[in-house]
Amino acid sequence: MSVVTRIAPSPTGDPHVGTAYIGLFNHTLAQQARARGEEGKFILRIEDTDRNRYVPDSERRIFQMMAWLGLTPDESPLQGGPNGPYRQSERTAIYGEYARKLVEAGHAYYAFETPEELAALREAAQQEGRVIAVPSRDLDPAEAQRRVDAGESAVIRLKVPREGETVVNDALRKPIAFQNREIDDKVLLKADGYPTYHLANVVDDHLMGVTHVIRAEEWITSTPIHVLLYRAFGWAEPIFAHMPLLRNADKSKISKRKNPTSVEWYMAQGFLPEAMLNFLATMGWTHPEGKEIFDLAEFQRVFRLEDVTLGGPVFSLDKLRWMNGKYLREVLSEEEVAERLHAYLASQKHDLPDDDYFRAVVRMMIPRMDVFSEFLEKTPYFWSEDYPVSEKAQHLIEEGRPFLPELAARLKNLPSFDPATTEAALRAFAEERGLKPGKVMQPLRAAIAGTSESPGMFELLEVLGQERVVARVERAARGG
């Protein structure tokens, strides 16, 4: 069976994690069809008909997000394809043609009400607890056509049946029945020739051969309109599956007020795309073997649409950070982490040499960071002598100042600076002074790193190197 899926984001702002989430499942269904030897196609089209909210750079950023995630579409405005154009703003003539076909068939009508008239009609309908009744619905079609031909401004509205019900079949739910009397006559084509979401969505999905409409559950209430349109055109309906919405911890719909929703924020923070995909895959779905860490290929191997659960999945930033840390420590090799961290730092305009010193610092920090943006925050003392000294570290330096000059001399005279040598020397130094080792090592750490928290002392000494360590201890001893 052919599987043709799509996502249709609107270029109205930041590329949203919700687009990535829905894109993952649509991409996966198409890939699974290919793996079975069937046709599988994933389409990305741009729904840019809301010109009031259009943001010029947003489309490029959507493509950038999809490329970062590795969810490459088979057809899109970028690479084209047999079903183009893929921007709705370039398809207005198509929508006008199909809207007029519905008028000719008696499934839609021209409506001439002014905004003021519509406001009054809506108020009356609200007071009476019913959907709006549009007078133009009862106009003689020939009279309506004459007015349009004369240049009068009109929209085209769907003529929803007055009686009966429209049933939505959803692959994740029991059939949902909507009473037709509670569905208003939606505008399909605006007076300026631009379509509404409902018409453009259905026409595009049909003409592009979409077989599966996988989208967020917020579109369920729009689906009876789409079902009525499919029936009015005489077209077969696709399979609908409405995915659970991503939620904040309080179960409210995810929003940037409570969680970063722009994928660009996660990119800038240094999250890995593999971890983001892994995390999004667990939103409403559980690996059949209980695995928490798995790659995209594994997800495509075991995912089944019918296994999606509908309880609102919580988008936990803490869980995503934990998962990203697992990738750094357990999935990627040290070499891969170093290479990708260096590329990330370069993208953030931090020019560090990719040398043995850099890689030694990376090796120490892998257990101590969850995302790449933490790397420089936690390692300023590796890259500059002008590193910050915390208040606690300053206090520790003051405590150790009586013995720091002698400690500097002892470290300076060591024949080597490997961990075994420095550990033995520091423990001997503490014992000679009748101190516990920590009473020596804590001021030393504060002096060479400006913090009371750092990687293991002896590894830290080796990576910083004897010359740098001695100079810093001498400076701290002088009170500098």
Curated annotation (Swiss-Prot):
EC nos: 6.1.1.17
PROSITE patterns reported for this sequence: AA_TRNA_LIGASE_I
Enzyme class: ligase
Record SUPFAM superfamilies: An anticodon-binding domain of class I aminoacyl-tRNA synthetases, Nucleotidylyl transferase
Catalytic activities: tRNA(Glu) + L-glutamate + ATP = L-glutamyl-tRNA(Glu) + AMP + diphosphate
Annotated GO biological process: glutamyl-tRNA aminoacylation
Keyword Endoplasmic reticulum assigned: no
InterPro entries tied to this protein: aa-tRNA-synth_I_cd-bd, aa-tRNA-synth_I_codon-bd_sub2, aa-tRNA-synth_I_CS, aa_tRNA-synth_I_cd-bd_sf, Glu-tRNA-ligase_bac/mito, Glu-tRNA-synth_I_codon-bd_sub1, Glu/Gln-tRNA-synth, Glu/Gln-tRNA-synth_Ib_cat-dom
Cellular location(s): Cytoplasm
Principal subcellular localization: cytoplasm
Cellular component per GO, a single term: cytosol
Positions contributing to ATP binding: 256
Keywords in alphabetical order: Aminoacyl-tRNA synthetase, ATP-binding, Cytoplasm, Ligase, Nucleotide-binding, Protein biosynthesis
Position of sequence motif 'HIGH' region: 9-19
TM spans (from-to): none
Molecular-function GO terms, alphabetical: ATP binding; glutamate-tRNA ligase activity; tRNA binding; zinc ion binding
UniProt motif ('KMSKS' region) ranges: 253-257
Pfam family, any one: tRNA-synt_1c
Cytoplasm in keyword set: yes
Subunit structure and binding partners: Monomer.
Family: Belongs to the class-I aminoacyl-tRNA synthetase family. Glutamate--tRNA ligase type 1 subfamily.
HAMAP family referenced in this protein's UniProt entry, alphabetically: Glu_tRNA_synth_type1 (MF_00022)
Function (record text): Catalyzes the attachment of glutamate to tRNA(Glu) in a two-step reaction: glutamate is first activated by ATP to form Glu-AMP and then transferred to the acceptor end of tRNA(Glu).
Name used for this protein in its record: Glutamate--tRNA ligase
Gene name of the encoded protein: gltX
